[in-house]
Amino acid sequence: MKDVMGLIFTGENDIHLGELTSLRAVAALPIAGRYRVIDFQLSSMVHSGIKNVGVITQKNYSSLMDHIGSGREWDLHGKQGLVMLPPFLTRENMGVYSGLLDALKSNCTYLRLSRQEYIVLTNSHTIYNMDYTDALKYHIEKGADVTVLYAHGAKAVGTEGENDTFLSVDEDGKVTGMEIGS
């Protein structure tokens, strides 16, 4: 998948994790003593053939940077293989992204300079393994602007619905509506 770059957003709301995320990002939380939450997204991207991955950080990302290092564990240590994208202090940005859209806007230069035509954008707080190859093929075949991967009827445990996003889709799978935080 030469024409695809990966982008992992690590600025999720961590309010339910309290002390666990007081000094580290959700993406840097340990899993089974050896892995971190972000390992699943990085591995899924690399196993899908994605060779250029940007990690958008928000706060408490020191341990995340220590864990990821140069990206060698995922064979992303070459030129443009793995890029950390912290919130830089600028006129428009006070050093913290206000959300995903602000993070994307702040990193437009990085996105424009990439050689890839497509972007796989994911968060870092969901643990799963996935091969994105079929999803990208589907996206290209449909000529879609955006393709959303979702689980039908899934609900995150312990979220009490405050940040859930519900999609309405037609019989062809096209999104016809969206409700956030109901």
Regions found by a protein language model. Give the residues of each.
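Unchanged
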Residues: 1-182
